[in-house]
Amino acid sequence: MAFSKKTRQEAITKIQNEEMDLLVIGGGITGAGLTLQAAAAGMKVAVLEMQDFSEGTSSRSTKLVHGGIRYLKNFDVEVVSDTVSERAVVQGIAPHIPKPDPMLLPIYDDEGKTTFDMFSVKIAMDLYDRLAGVDEDSPYANYTISPEEVLRREPLIKKKGLQGAGVYLDYRNNDARLVIDNIKKAVEDGAQAISKMKVIDFIYTDGQISGIRARDLLTDQVIEVKAKLVINTSGPWVDKIRYLNFTRPIVPKMRPTKGVHLVVDAAKLPVPQPTYFDTGKHDKRMVFAIPRENKTYFGTTDTDYHGDFTDPKVTQEDVDYLLDVINFRYPEANITINDIEASWAGLRPLLGGNSGSDYNGGDNGAVSETSFNAVVEAVLRYKNKTATKAEVEHLLNNMESSLSEKGDAPSSVSRGSSLERESDGLITLAGGKITDYRKMAAGAMELICQLLEEDFGLKYEPIDSKKYQISGGEFDPTKVEEVVAENMKVGVAAGLTEEEAKYIADFYGMNALQVFAYASEMEAYEGLSLAESARLCYALEDEMILTPVDYLLRRTNHILFMREGVDAIKVHVVNAMADDLGWSAEEKAEQEKALEEALRESDLSDLKK
């Protein structure tokens, strides 16, 4: 399926000449998921993104499909139940992206009041497994380990006060890949998806929005697109879209916060599995340290943000905070700013009335001390075989019902998100977590189908989005390893090494077969390996890359987790893209400059001076 700069102008022409049923503003995970569901239902749908797909927020997360175990500190059962249930759905529709990766949660007794102790962490993990449907005999069932075992796994971790640790199931994620594979499936189903296209104005008919004006940031051309419905899924930008033309008095919905992550070499901070721990600053926060691609990254911060949404920066204050936290937890590592190889800063699109972040918990829906004690007692009785599993489930189900949002307004799609239609017809889908994206889109689809039928006489049926697999994920989710092994053979036959073929098969899912097809047909680009050349060719032909940063940062993880290799290939990537996309000498120089700026920003060169 071609999805490239070559097809981009065709899409622009098409949306100018045909009225869309639905126009989606914002190509992050929420807009991508909604566009896929709309296209699969047969709608004429277009999604416009002013940057690269996922560039604004959705590629800047902690890169987990996180179960939110910290919420169980307050027994916010409904949040965790929703999250782990939806996580299982996402793993089923995108089995090549979220991968199980058990999390280690160390426990200390010398740091004052902490999130968990050894007793409460076991209770929380048992509840977590029950909510996640993890059986006791599953290889992913939770367990506790001794201080000695913790130190065997992580010899640099703080020894004083260590009581042991809990280990429970969590999932690593490739956030940018999740977005682009939703977009690609939507395009395959007939959607028009255009990046570098900024919505600048609304078109009105009789006081109702009937389309948009947008500026093509590649050509500066302004286009008009007619649409029956327009939905705003622009993440932290939703208020800015709502403010366009100042046509409506609005109450701001968003309270964005900034999260920062830092990357060091695994030799400097050897962490064999994801680890989740209190900061030690008595600020009621927890931080992750996560291994990936022979690197370890750690974060996140969580601070209110009022700066430039397009490109939030890592500040010295952010670095100081995270270095203090990581060196407190791993005192022998002695990490300094000069050890940082890469970094990223992103915004969380939190609703103003729901400022507790995805990772740091909150007291929304917290239960009373009485309910807390009742649950603990029930679980202990179950462990001692004096209560049945059904009795525990009955208690939890009653608690979930009391905490659920069933009594809320219909506009509430899920906790931390909202769906509203304003007086001029603009629909806004805001807030939420990456894990919630499919569920949020499904909730919006119900409203969209209703409006299209009532107002325009068009009848569409939403798809079963719980089973509709995204691009690259079209295989049995219980057979990930078998599929990778089988596809890997194709890569080896195409001339790649076993290591290269396995990496690509794991990274792209079923789309690896197209990467391998390019490898078998092409000569390697000058200065690049055949594997790198095939990946770049695939990104150019099928993944709408328009800049070197699109490829090196979001379609791959090179800038974040293979920083030492980027300098060796960056010139050759630019040269290959310049030839393919027909850049002039001036355009090529601009792209080289933009890439160098992105690298300097990522490796914190300005702060290291």
Curated annotation (Swiss-Prot):
GO CC annotations, alphabetized: cytoplasm
Cofactor: FAD
The organism's place on the tree of life at top rank: Bacteria
Single GO MF annotation: glycerol-3-phosphate dehydrogenase (quinone) activity
Binding site for FAD: 21-49
Catalytic reaction equation(s): sn-glycerol 3-phosphate + O2 = dihydroxyacetone phosphate + H2O2
InterPro entries per the UniProt record, alphabetical: DAO_C, DAO_C_sf, FAD-dep_OxRdtase, FAD/NAD-bd_sf, G3P_DH_FAD-dep
Enzyme Commission number, as recorded: 1.1.3.21
Protein name: Alpha-glycerophosphate oxidase
Organism: Lactococcus lactis subsp. lactis (strain IL1403) (Streptococcus lactis)
